[in-house]
Amino acid sequence: MSDVTTAEFNEEGKYLRKVRSFVLREGRLTKGQAQAMEQQWPSMGLDYTPEAIDLVEVFGREADTVLEIGFGMGGSLVEMAKASPELNFIGIEVHKPGVGACLSVAAEAGVTNLRVYHHDALEVLENSIAEGSLARVQLFFPDPWHKKRHHKRRIVQAPFAELIRSKLKVGGVFHLATDWENYSEHMLEVMTAAPGYKNQSATGDVVERPEHRPLTKFEARGHRLGHGVWDLMFERV
């Protein structure tokens, strides 16, 4: 579930209020998660500040940076970081047990190219990430808010697409994935209408799951049951 507060607008684009696109269910940390938070946070954790971070200073090198919004328990994010040591990875997650789990798995995997925020993603994106600094932004399996009256809570809306674009460098990619077909249609509609993006799909809709996105256990089970997953990739132009 994605950890973002997103703005609600009326049909004329007038700002109404902010609504949560996630439900905060703060569970207790396991002993291992708590230990990981204590031991790994100094090296992998990023404390939120309202100023843009210096990526070279944070990672100690110049490299393309990938940011994931709402990484859950972090297994896939760590897998991606381990598979692509030439890239920098930043994950944002509002649920503390997920952050602890991610840090634990990252330490076990020995990755050094991953940093994580335990904070609201919209605030991080707006204030802590410099414009034009990201090579890729990932939003995998956000809450679909499948009831129609809750669609306004979906994170993928026009203002959000505009915010993501401002943080991507030219040629950078916004990669979305969902296992809810109606949400994939909503994503496609929003992203197609968003200025300054080019759909990487040759057919103008979805793409095959790229190799860089690991197949999750949940997703693999869904495949066996005949459930679909839809990937969308839009490039900043």
Curated annotation (Swiss-Prot):
GO terms for molecular function: tRNA (guanine(46)-N7)-methyltransferase activity. Disulfide bonds: none annotated. One of its GO terms (cellular component) is tRNA methyltransferase complex. Catalyzes the formation of N(7)-methylguanine at position 46 (m7G46) in tRNA. NCBIfam families: tRNA (guanosine(46)-N7)-methyltransferase TrmB. PANTHER family: 3-DEOXY-D-MANNO-OCTULOSONIC-ACID TRANSFERASE/TRNA GUANINE-N 7 - -METHYLTRANSFERASE, PENTACOTRIPEPTIDE-REPEAT REGION OF PRORP DOMAIN-CONTAINING PROTEIN. This is tRNA (guanine-N(7)-)-methyltransferase. It comes from Shewanella piezotolerans (strain WP3 / JCM 13877). The lineage of its organism: Bacteria, Pseudomonadati, Pseudomonadota, Gammaproteobacteria, Alteromonadales. The gene is trmB.
